[in-house]
């Protein structure tokens, strides 16, 4: 196993522990707590994949960070902060909408790269909106936290979420996954639109009907994909 992979996991475990202590003092806002919960799942998945104990890794990560901080000067810290572009966290969904449990009458699931797509194919003839919470950097979607499909009544009928054991995805991965989700929902004569925020940063465009610019050929392909492969 690559030593950098192990040490990266150890540092991530320790930094999560620090953030958890911060949250335990009721100092974190909603986006902070949301990322904390998501990162916990990711660490568990990575730990299982690597065969590493999280508690042991956290202690090792603490030692690594202590060595780094001993050598860190205030001037170096200022330069590092200035050179790192800042990302923004955008929310279409409330914390309740993100954490709410939901159930599918006709569950369908597809894994696309590091993203998991889930659809309730019992849903027909509904108006559906896709909402997402995600981070943005350089005015482009950076990391998807969670995307969910809602009916006008507020019921959850679809979802795209990162797989904890396979961290890392691009904005193109997200757009392709959204295409699969839309195709699956439209296969049952549902009308799907995407939130304006998601359109703006995933496609850098906004349509009046809330429809991302997927060509008809891709739409038919996505519908067949969700029908045959899920």
UniProtKB/Swiss-Prot annotation:
A Pfam family assignment: Flu_NS1
Cleaved signal peptide residues: none
Domain of life according to the entry: Viruses
Region (PABPN1-binding) residue spans: 223-230
Subunit structure: Homodimer. Interacts with host TRIM25 (via coiled coil); this interaction specifically inhibits TRIM25 multimerization and TRIM25-mediated RIGI CARD ubiquitination. Interacts with human EIF2AK2/PKR, CPSF4, IVNS1ABP and PABPN1.
This protein's domain notes: The dsRNA-binding region is required for suppression of RNA silencing.
Region listing for Disordered, in residue ranges: 205-230
Main location: host cell
Keywords noted in UniProt: Eukaryotic host gene expression shutoff by virus, Host cytoplasm, Host gene expression shutoff by virus, Host mRNA suppression by virus, Host nucleus, Host-virus interaction, Inhibition of host innate immune response by virus, Inhibition of host interferon signaling pathway by virus, Inhibition of host PKR by virus, Inhibition of host pre-mRNA processing by virus, Inhibition of host RIG-I by virus, Inhibition of host RLR pathway by virus, Interferon antiviral system evasion, RNA-binding, Ubl conjugation, Viral immunoevasion
Motif position, Nuclear export signal: 137-146
One GO cellular component term noted in the UniProt record for this chain: host cell nucleus
Protein family membership: Belongs to the influenza A viruses NS1 family.
Name under which the protein is recorded: Non-structural protein 1
Localization, UniProt: Host nucleus; Host cytoplasm
Motif segment (Nuclear localization signal): 34-38
PTM entry text: Upon interferon induction, ISGylated via host HERC5; this results in the impairment of NS1 interaction with RNA targets due to its inability to form homodimers and to interact with host EIF2AK2/PKR.
């Amino acid at each position: 196993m690559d030593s950098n992979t192990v040490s990266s996991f150890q540092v991530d475990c320790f930094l999560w522990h620090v953030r958890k202590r911060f949250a335990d003092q009721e100092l974190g806002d909603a986006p902070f707590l949301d990322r904390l919960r998501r990162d916990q799942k990711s660490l568990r998945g990575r730990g299982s994949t690597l065969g590493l104990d999280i508690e042991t890794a956290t202690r090792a990560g603490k030692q690594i960070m202590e060595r780094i901080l001993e050598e860190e000067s205030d001037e170096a810290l200022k330069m590092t902060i200035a050179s790192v572009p800042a990302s923004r966290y955008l929310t279409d969904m409330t914390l309740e909408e993100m954490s709410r449990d939901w159930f599918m009458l006709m569950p369908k699931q597809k894994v696309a790269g590091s993203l998991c797509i889930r659809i309730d194919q019992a849903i027909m003839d509904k108006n559906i909106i896709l909402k997402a919470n995600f981070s943005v950097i350089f005015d482009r979607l950076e990391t998807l936290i969670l995307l969910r499909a809602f009916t006008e009544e507020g019921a959850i009928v679809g979802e795209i979420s990162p797989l904890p054991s396979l961290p890392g995805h691009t904005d193109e991965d997200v757009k392709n996954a959204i295409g699969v989700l839309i195709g699956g929902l439209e296969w049952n004569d549902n009308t799907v639109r995407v939130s304006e925020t998601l359109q703006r940063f995933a496609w850098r465009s906004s349509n009046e009907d809330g429809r991302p610019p997927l060509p008809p050929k891709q739409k038919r392909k996505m519908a067949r994909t969700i029908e045959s492969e899920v």
